[in-house]
Amino acid sequence: MLQKTGRGLLAFLLIVLEWTQPSLPSPLRPICDLRVLNHFIKEAQDAEAAMKLCSEGCTLSDSVIVPQTTVEFDVWEKKSALAKAQEVQSGLWLLQEAFNFLRTSVTNTALHSHIDNSVRNLLSVNAVLRSLNIQEFTPPASAAEIEGTWRVSTATELLQVHINFLRGKVRLILLDAQACQQDVS
């Protein structure tokens, strides 16, 4: 009887230890899982590849304003969380506006699904930011009012900016988000 009780107690302790994992970091919240962002980056790369293969009906009719994608890490680290959030959200808004313009410029219907998917992914990133309690972005009256922008004149350039923005500033803001910090107890 004592042997059975000892085994049961040992099994119970193992379950409790496995459940609490006292020295292991807690798992990240699903919204912090960078595999989702990597999936969005992969889809953006697929869109860029499709755009490069396009020979007709796949051009921008005018240049569009896009966010700067370069990140000076020492400058980024010194920015407040609010400044980082505003920079990322304004960049996402600029990209959405640029993709909406691209959608009206591109006559090749095969590319419309890539463009629509890119817009959906940008909206998903915005939803993730909202779920991380990052303050909503209020777009200005004009894209020209946003600092840290430049113009691109081809669809391929737009898609490259999209990829780099996701890889850079979006990834950094997710890594910096308080809710995404691993809790090492």
From Swiss-Prot:
MF-aspect GO terms: cytokine activity; erythropoietin receptor binding; hormone activity
Keywords per UniProt: Disulfide bond, Erythrocyte maturation, Hormone, Secreted, Signal
Tissues in which the UniProt entry reports expression: Expressed mainly in heart, liver and brain. Isoform 2 is brain specific.
GO biological process, one term: nucleate erythrocyte development
S-S bridge residues: C32-C180, C54-C58
SUPFAM superfamilies the UniProt entry points to: 4-helical cytokines
InterPro entries in UniProt: 4_helix_cytokine-like_core, EPO_TPO, Erythroptn
Claim: Signal is one of the keywords in the record: yes
Signal peptide: 1-25
Single GO cellular component term: perinuclear region of cytoplasm
Record's subcellular location: Secreted
Keyword Signal annotated: yes
Predominant subcellular localization, coarse grouping: secreted
Alphabetized Gene3D superfamilies for the sequence: 1.20.1250.10
Function summary: Erythropoietin is the principal hormone involved in the regulation of erythrocyte differentiation and the maintenance of a physiological level of circulating erythrocyte mass.
Family recorded in the similarity comment: Belongs to the EPO/TPO family.
Name of the featured protein: Erythropoietin
Species of the source: Takifugu rubripes (Japanese pufferfish)
Species lineage: Eukaryota, Metazoa, Chordata, Craniata, Vertebrata
Gene that this polypeptide is encoded by: epo
